[in-house]
């Protein structure tokens, strides 16, 4: 959806149509909110079942695994809802802001990895919680920057079905391509876990970095 959102915002900017720009941004937020809802429903049903019933996780690490899983769902939702703001910044060609925020995000992630050495709590849980908090902070920064610099970046309660259908259709092919890549990468990780246990997942995770 990122490329579709960016494309439609850029087109509206080129036309100089502020009303269309507001429609595109608000429609994009609605689409991403719907995607987030689907992620939550699937994650808290099929995902939890798969975690408890199929994945090979030592009993003493199950609590940590559940924490990581729930934080991952929350982080995914935050990332999904950040897409319209990211696309808006790129469409307006504010690359310096995008670069500075990205540098801040990477620096914070490096900081929490370094802080794990000093953490008195479970390091896996600590990393998952702080990763989610960083995603939330970056999302707030993007939203604040966009609302301050781009008037269209404030949500308006509009429902424009033709635009919704057009954006969804445009994003369809890239969606299936990205979904295939995710299923290949994460599906392989899950298969390795199911047949060989977590001992094989660790080197696999390092290998694909």
How should these model regions be labeled?
Residues 1-34, 51-57, 85, 90-97:
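Transmembrane-helix boundary and interhelical linker motifs in polytopic inner-membrane proteins
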Residues 70, 99-149, 166-170, 201-209:
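Hydrophobic alpha-helical transmembrane segments
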Residues 31, 66-71, 94-98, 169-176:
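Short alpha-helical transmembrane interface motifs in multi-pass membrane proteins
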Residues 45-48, 57-82, 99, 103, ...:
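Alpha-helical transmembrane segments of multi-pass membrane proteins
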Residues 124-130, 142-190, 194, 199-200:
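Interhelical loop/hinge segments that connect adjacent transmembrane helices in multipass membrane
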Residues 29-56, 111, 115:
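Alpha-helical transmembrane segments of multi-pass membrane transport and lipid-handling proteins
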Residues 1-13, 28-39, 74-82, 138, ...:
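Small-residue-rich midsections of specific transmembrane alpha-helices
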Residues 52-56, 117-120, 182-209:
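Helix-terminus/linker motif at the lipid-water interface of multi-pass membrane proteins
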